[in-house]
Amino acid sequence: MSNTVATMINKRNIMRNYIKIGVAGPVGAGKTALIEKLTREIASKYSVAVITNDIYTQEDAEFLTKNSLLPPERIMGVETGGCPHTAIREDASMNLEAVDEMVTRFPDVEIVFIESGGDNLSATFSPDLADVTIFVIDVAQGEKIPRKGGPGITRSDLLVINKTDLAPFVGADLSVMERDARRMRNGQPFIFTNLMKKENLDGVIGWIEKYALLKNVEEPASLVR
């Protein structure tokens, strides 16, 4: 068994039958789009629920209600009313209560996605709130983003570098981003995606199945280490 898989097992509470996946990243990077695409692909195979975080609105929850295949009652918006860091890390009580309510409502739930409010590169989830974490950045922010570091870049279980199709328009060199991500991640996986066209979405799903759900499947070839 790899150290990565062992770590995932240790982080997961084996007394429950669901996994909590935290999804964080800067505003506009593609967090909500990732969850929307994922739920469309896996909702027929797994029982899924989603918790979203916005400071003053429930815009992300409303988007997912309109665009994902999940029933509205499986999507819950949390209005944090303040710094998005606090609601997922220092005081995650609102989100923990939302998760408890959701899994009580749907005892068959296998995956709970928890989307943070849009934040910078320092967002991290409380280990009580998320079993595994995905951090989303995008190419439009510039090729320098991976080497800027921060906990989201260096500590997340999976780094998603989204909007690869925009690289020619913003002067970003994907090979430079790959080199820097390898250096900053130190062996932890990352993946390039174009979520608008679902490019490498299957790789994210494969990572979830292998390292979050602990299925006996091959590591996706699109993952980079």
From Swiss-Prot:
Q: Which SUPFAM superfamilies match?
A: P-loop containing nucleoside triphosphate hydrolases (SSF52540)
Q: What is its main location?
A: cytoplasm
Q: Which GO terms describe its biological process?
A: urea catabolic process
**Which cellular component appears as one GO term in the record?**
cytoplasm
Q: Which Pfam families match?
A: cobW
Q: Name one GO molecular function term.
A: GTPase activity
The UniProt keywords, alphabetically, are: Chaperone, Cytoplasm, GTP-binding, Nickel insertion, Nucleotide-binding
Q: Which InterPro entries match?
A: CobW/HypB/UreG_nucleotide-bd, P-loop_NTPase, UreG
Q: Give binding positions for GTP.
A: G25, P26, V27, G28, A29, G30, K31, T32
Record localization: Cytoplasm
What the entry lists under CDD domains is as follows: UreG
HAMAP family on file = UreG
Query: PANTHER family given for it?
Result: UREASE ACCESSORY PROTEIN G
Task: Give a short account of what the protein does.
Answer: Facilitates the functional incorporation of the urease nickel metallocenter. This process requires GTP hydrolysis, probably effectuated by UreG.
User: Which family would the database say this protein is a member of?
Assistant: Belongs to the SIMIBI class G3E GTPase family. UreG subfamily.
What does the subunit comment say? Homodimer. UreD, UreF and UreG form a complex that acts as a GTP-hydrolysis-dependent molecular chaperone, activating the urease apoprotein by helping to assemble the nickel containing metallocenter of UreC. The UreE protein probably delivers the nickel.
NCBIfam families, per database record? ureG (TIGR00101)
This protein's name? Urease accessory protein UreG
Q: Which species?
A: Haemophilus influenzae (strain ATCC 51907 / DSM 11121 / KW20 / Rd)
Give the gene that encodes this protein: ureG
